[in-house]
Amino acid sequence: MYINYLKDLISFKSVTPKSDGAIEYINDLLKQHGFKTEIKIFGDSKSEQVTNLYAVFGSNEPNICFVGHVDVVLEGNHELWHNASPFKVSQQDGKIYGRGAVDMKGAIACFLAASLDFIKNNTDFKGSISFLLTSDEEGKAKHGTKEMLQYIYDQGYKINFAIVGEPTCEKEIGDAIKIGRRGSVNFKLNIEGLSGHVAYPHKANNPLPCLIIILNELTNIKLDEGTEFFQRSNLEVTNIEVSNNTSNVIPASTEASFNIRFNNLHSAETLAKQVEEIIKQHCKEYKVDYKLEYSSSAESFIQNPSDKIKEFAKVVEHTLKIKPEFSTSGGTSDARFVKNYCPLVEFGLLSETAHKINEYTKISDLQKLYDVYYNFLMEIL
């Protein structure tokens, strides 16, 4: 059934933060199979409204919750997709093409099938199975999983263990389980000089040499050596702007943006202080003014492998005959919100085609993921 569920889910044009009916489809399906469901819409305005779902079968502990998102990134040029439509499934050579196939409608489809089959085959299991789904993970992630978790806990629900269905595997299903994530902090630096004619540099103060020196130092600084579970923190320049289209004018100002992906040796605040010390030193030397702004969407985190995390890893190994590696690579995810409530793993399909034109998953990979999810429910419940 996971193939049918996936095809149905891909057909919804759920570009973040819209559900486009995807969450309602899942809600109806789960309700038909005895789940207690609730849809909540959060958001400050109509354009920011986010659809969220919590559905639970059973009332006993442990509550095993699948956490995911139905929203997808923009599809790009339709003409480059199979069938010229990213929301019309194309099935070829054992693969299913469509936006969201791996990120992450495929994982949702597999856990839907696994949980419904498990409930059908095990009428007296000891715990609960639940879903927490949102339509806002790829975007601002402001009114999605974070807000929904707070809501369900206020209602008296408790999650004992979560599976976040992000596409975590690298080369084959089962090679990686994420137990943490790097943090992310964005910087915007504005340097104010004094404009003038290029023939009279002594009557101006060009902000660009200062910016070049600063960016050179920042991009060459070694923030750390990495840790057991984390790679080195890295800084990447993402944009440089100079509002000057005239070749004989020294610009008055310049602006640069950069991002740091950091491990658990840092926080956004400590990195901001380190960055500003470098900026302050060079701006003083060049006698220019600066303004530095920064914002962080996620701090880094790492979990000590709990008993349930270890059990999940054993299920992966026994099911797929591959020993998974505990990993923290990749970008940010909603796991950063879930970890405040319960232990978790992130485990899903291959990440290779996520967000790309002709995103696809192999049907054989869907079967493997289904098997892991089903076997874990059998083991834990």
Swiss-Prot record:
All disulfide bonds of the chain are none
| GO annotation terms (biological process) | diaminopimelate biosynthetic process; L-arginine biosynthetic process; lysine biosynthetic process via diaminopimelate
Pathway note = Amino-acid biosynthesis; L-lysine biosynthesis via DAP pathway; LL-2,6-diaminopimelate from (S)-tetrahydrodipicolinate (succinylase route): step 3/3
Answer yes or no on keyword Amino-acid biosynthesis: yes
Q: InterPro entries this protein is in?
A: ArgE/DapE_CS, Bact_exopeptidase_dim_dom, DapE_proteobac, Peptidase_M20, Peptidase_M20_dimer, Peptidase_M20A
User: Per its record, what are the GO molecular function terms?
Assistant: acetylornithine deacetylase activity; cobalt ion binding; succinyl-diaminopimelate desuccinylase activity; zinc ion binding
Matches recorded under CDD domains = M20_DapE_proteobac
Reactions performed catalytically: N-succinyl-(2S,6S)-2,6-diaminopimelate + H2O = (2S,6S)-2,6-diaminopimelate + succinate
Q: Is this entry keyworded Iron-sulfur? A: no
Gene3D superfamilies per record:
3.30.70.360, Zn peptidases (3.40.630.10)
Q: Which residues bind Zn(2+) 2?
A: D103, E138, H355
How the cofactor is bound: the record states: Binds 2 Zn(2+) or Co(2+) ions per subunit.
Record's keyword terms, sorted: Amino-acid biosynthesis, Cobalt, Diaminopimelate biosynthesis, Hydrolase, Lysine biosynthesis, Metal-binding, Zinc
SUPFAM superfamilies named among the record's database cross-references: Bacterial exopeptidase dimerisation domain, Zn-dependent exopeptidases
> Which N-terminal residues, if any, form the signal peptide?
none
Q: What is its EC number?
A: 3.5.1.18
Question: Where, in this chain's numbering, is Zn(2+) 1 bound?
Answer: H69, D103, E166
Location of the active site: D71, E137
Cofactor(s) recorded for this entry are: Zn(2+); Co(2+)
Q: How does it assemble?
A: Homodimer.
Q: What family is this protein classified in?
A: Belongs to the peptidase M20A family. DapE subfamily.
Protein purpose: Catalyzes the hydrolysis of N-succinyl-L,L-diaminopimelic acid (SDAP), forming succinate and LL-2,6-diaminopimelate (DAP), an intermediate involved in the bacterial biosynthesis of lysine and meso-diaminopimelic acid, an essential component of bacterial cell walls.
Q: What is this protein called?
A: Succinyl-diaminopimelate desuccinylase
Report the source organism. Rickettsia rickettsii (strain Sheila Smith)
Source gene? dapE
